[in-house]
Regions:
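An alpha-helical repeat/solenoid feature that recognizes helix-turn-helix modules
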Residues: 1-35, 43-91, 95-138, 156-313, ...
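Inter-helical turn/loop segments and adjacent helix faces that build the functional surface
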Residues: 11-20, 69-78, 316-326, 393-409, ...
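Active/binding-pocket-proximal capping segment
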Residues: 18-20, 34-43, 58-61, 65, ...
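Eukaryote-specific, cytoplasm-facing alpha-helical/coiled-coil scaffolding segments in long proteins
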Residues: 64-65, 146-159, 259, 414-418, ...
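Extended charged low-complexity segments that act as oligomerization/scaffolding linkers
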Residues: 84-102, 106-113, 453-475, 480-491
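All-alpha helical catalytic cores of prenyl diphosphate-utilizing isoprenoid enzymes
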Residues: 293-422, 426-433, 499-512
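Divalent-cation-assisted or electrostatically stabilized phosphate/pyrophosphate-binding catalytic cores
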Residues: 371-379, 407-417, 432-483
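Acidic, carboxylate-rich catalytic segments that either coordinate divalent cations
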Residues: 462-468, 487-524
C-alpha cells in the first residue's frame, strides 16, 4: 500500500495523474504515510528484526515500508533513524546462516502459512529495493507546509517535560509532526460557529498531547480515528469553556437557576439528536418575570450553545460502539460539567466585584465551602477531565460495558475523580497570575492558603498548591495501578494499555500547565 501511494503521489507531482479530493491529498495521504513510517520505526526489535517471531519475511515487509516512505521523514533526525533501522534490518536478514523450520511461518487471518519461495522473494526485494529518501525528498512538501522551525520548537518544548526526559527525541519530534498533520483538519473546528476558532499554534500543541502520549509506548497504539476525535474533543472543550465563561459572566444571579434547569432537562431527554419535538418541550419558559429583553436574548443564546455542546459530545459517531450505560455515564458527566460552569460563573463574578478579603496579591474568597469540599465537588466537574475520560471509554468500547464488575466500575469512577482533582491542582499551579488578572477563581483564593500558619510552615501559596498536586499524584497512580492490574489479570491488556496512554496524556498536559502556564493563548 505504501509503495502504491508513494508511486501515485510521484506520478501526480509529474502531472501524469489527476489529484484526489483535497482532504485526501493534503491531510489523509501525508498522515497515513508518515504514521506508516514512525510506527514501523517504533516497533523494531533490538536485534534489528520486526515481529514477535524474529521472522526474516516480516522484517522484509518493514524494510520495504521504510524504503518506500523514507521521503516522508521531514527532518534530518528522523531520516537518520530510518537509515539506521533499515541498516539494522538488513543486517539481521543477511547474517542469518540458515532457515529454521518456524522462521517464516506467519499468520494470515486464521491460517498459519509458510511459502519459502514467496518469503525469499520478499527478502530479496527488501535487500535490493531502492531508497526514496533523497530521490523523492521534495514530494511531501508538495502536499503539506511543514515548518521545520515549528517542529524543532515543539520538540524542545515537550522534551523539557519531566515525563519525557527518557523518551527518545526522535519520538517527540515525530509526535510533533503527527500533531501538525492532524491540525490541518482540527484548525477548522468551530463548535459554536462563533467565527473564533482557537489559534493554530494552540491546536498543534493540544494535538501533540495525544500523539506524544500515544507514541511514548508502542505496545498498543490508539487508532488514528480515535486520536483525532479525542484531540477534537479536547479543543472543543476549550472552545466551550471560553464561550460559557464569557456568556455567563454578564448574567444576573437570578438567571443562573434558569440555565441550570435547562441543563437538567436536556440531560434527561432521550434521542436528543433525532427528535425535533424535544426542543419544543425544552423551550418552556421559566425565566424570571423581571428579566429585560437583552437578558432574555442572552439566556436563549446560552441555551442554544448548551444544546450544541451536548450534541457535539454525544455525537453518534463518537458513541456508536459503546454500551447504553457507558453512553449515559458520559451524558451525565457532561451535565455535571456544564452545571459546574454556572457555579464557576457566580464565583468569578464575586471575585470581580471584590467580594472577599483583598490583598496586593490576590483576593481571599468568602465561601460557605472549605477548599477540600469545593475541590472534590464542583471543581472536579468544572475541570472537565472526566468528560474526556468517559468519551475515551465510549470510543474504545465494543458494544458492551468496558468495565464489567462492580469493583471495576467503582475503581474507574474513582480514577476519573482522582485525575480531575490532580488536574485541577496542576492547572491552578500554572495559572495563579493569569486567574488573578482575569478575576477567575483559583485554588489559592481559598483562605486556607493565606493563613499565617500555612504561609509560615508550608511556604507561599504556589508552593502549597504544588505540594498538594504532588500529594494527589501519588493517589492517582495508585488508582490507575489497581485498575490496570485487574484488567491485565482478566485478559484485557489492550484496555489497560489504553488507560495508561490516557494517563500519560493527562500527565503531559498537567506538566505543561505547571511548567509553561499553558493556556489557549499559548504561542510558539
Amino acid at each position: 500500500m505504501c509503495e502504491a501511494l508513494v508511486s501515485y503521489i510521484q506520478r501526480w507531482s509529474e502531472g501524469h495523474l489527476a489529484a484526489l479530493p483535497d482532504n485526501l491529498m493534503r491531510s489523509q495521504l501525508p498522515l497515513t504515510l508518515f504514521q506508516s513510517l514512525i510506527r514501523t520505526l517504533h516497533t523494531q526489535n533490538q536485534d534489528g528484526s520486526w515481529g514477535s517471531s524474529n521472522s526474516a519475511e516480516e522484517t522484509a515487509y518493514a524494510i520495504l515500508i521504510l524504503k518506500s516512505v523514507a521521503c516522508f521523514s521531514f527532518t534530518e533526525m528522523i531520516a537518520a533513524q530510518v537509515e539506521t533501522a533499515i541498516s539494522k534490518g538488513l543486517e539481521f536478514i543477511l547474517t542469518r546462516s540458515q532457515r529454521s523450520p518456524t522462521d517464516d511461518q506467519l499468520w494470515l487471518d486464521k491460517t498459519l502459512y509458510a511459502i519459502p519461495t514467496v518469503s525469499d522473494s520478499y527478502i530479496m526485494a527488501a535487500v535490493q529495493a531502492e531508497e526514496t529518501i533523497h530521490k523523492l525528498a521534495e514530494i511531501p512538501y508538495k502536499l503539506v507546509n511543514m515548518s521545520t522551525v515549528t517542529v524543532h520548537k515543539m520538540t524542545e518544548y515537550f522534551s523539557q517535560l519531566p515525563s519525557q526526559m527518557q523518551t527518545p527525541k526522535w519520538v517527540i519530534q515525530a509526535s510533533a509532526i503527527e500533531a501538525i498533520l492532524l491540525s490541518d483538519r482540527l484548525k477548522t473546528l468551530d463548535v459554536f460557529s462563533t467565527g473564533r476558532p482557537l489559534g493554530e499554534k494552540y491546536i498543534k500543541m493540544a494535538a501533540c498531547f495525544w500523539t506524544l502520549a500515544n507514541n511514548s509506548d508502542p505496545e498498543c497504539l490508539l487508532s488514528t480515528r480515535n486520536i483525532y476525535t479525542m484531540a477534537e474533543l479536547s479543543i472543543g472543550l476549550f472552545q466551550e469553556d471560553d464561550l460559557m465563561e464569557r456568556s455567563l459572566a454578564g448574567l444576573p444571579d437570578s438567571a443562573i437557576p434558569v440555565i441550570a434547569d435547562y441543563i437538567d432537562k436536556l440531560s434527561h431527554a432521550t434521542n436528543l439528536c433525532r427528535d425535533p419535538s424535544l426542543h419544543q418541550c425544552l423551550d418552556g419558559d421559566n425565566t424570571p418575570p423581571d428579566m429585560d429583553e437583552e437578558g432574555l436574548t442572552r439566556v436563549k443564546a446560552i441555551r442554544q450553545n448548551i444544546d450544541l455542546w451536548f450534541r457535539f459530545v454525544s455525537d453518534e459517531n463518537l458513541t456508536r460502539n459503546t454500551s447504553s450505560s457507558d453512553r449515559l455515564d458520559l451524558q451525565q458527566e457532561v451535565k455535571m460539567a456544564t452545571l459546574a460552569a454556572t457555579q464557576r460563573a457566580r464565583a468569578n463574578r464575586a471575585l470581580s466585584n471584590g467580594n472577599g478579603h483583598s490583598t496586593t496579591e490576590h483576593i481571599t474568597v468568602l465561601s460557605d465551602q472549605n477548599f477540600y469540599t469545593w475541590l472534590h465537588t464542583s471543581a472536579v466537574h468544572d475541570v472537565k477531565s472526566a468528560v474526556v475520560s468517559k468519551a475515551l471509554i465510549c470510543k474504545i468500547g465494543n458494544g458492551g460495558d468496558v468495565f464489567i464488575t462492580a469493583k471495576e466500575k467503582y475503581l474507574a469512577e474513582r480514577l476519573w475523580r482522582q485525575m480531575s482533582v490532580e488536574g485541577r491542582l496542576w492547572n491552578d499551579v500554572g495559572s495563579i497570575e493569569r486567574d488573578r488578572l482575569a478575576s477567575n477563581l483559583n485554588s489559592v483564593n481559598f483562605p486556607e492558603f493565606s493563613s499565617p500558619q500555612s504561609l509560615k510552615l508550608d511556604g507561599d501559596v504556589r508552593t502549597q498548591l504544588l505540594q498538594l498536586a504532588e500529594y494527589e499524584q501519588k493517589y492517582t497512580l495508585s488508582c490507575l495501578n489497581d485498575l490496570t492490574q485487574i484488567l491485565d489479570n482478566s485478559g484485557r491488556r489492550t484496555i489497560s494499555l489504553y488507560l495508561q496512554m490516557y494517563y500519560r496524556c493527562c500527565v503531559i498536559y498537567n506538566e505543561t500547565c505547571a511548567k509553561y502556564a499553558f493556556g489557549s493563548t499559548t504561542a510558539m
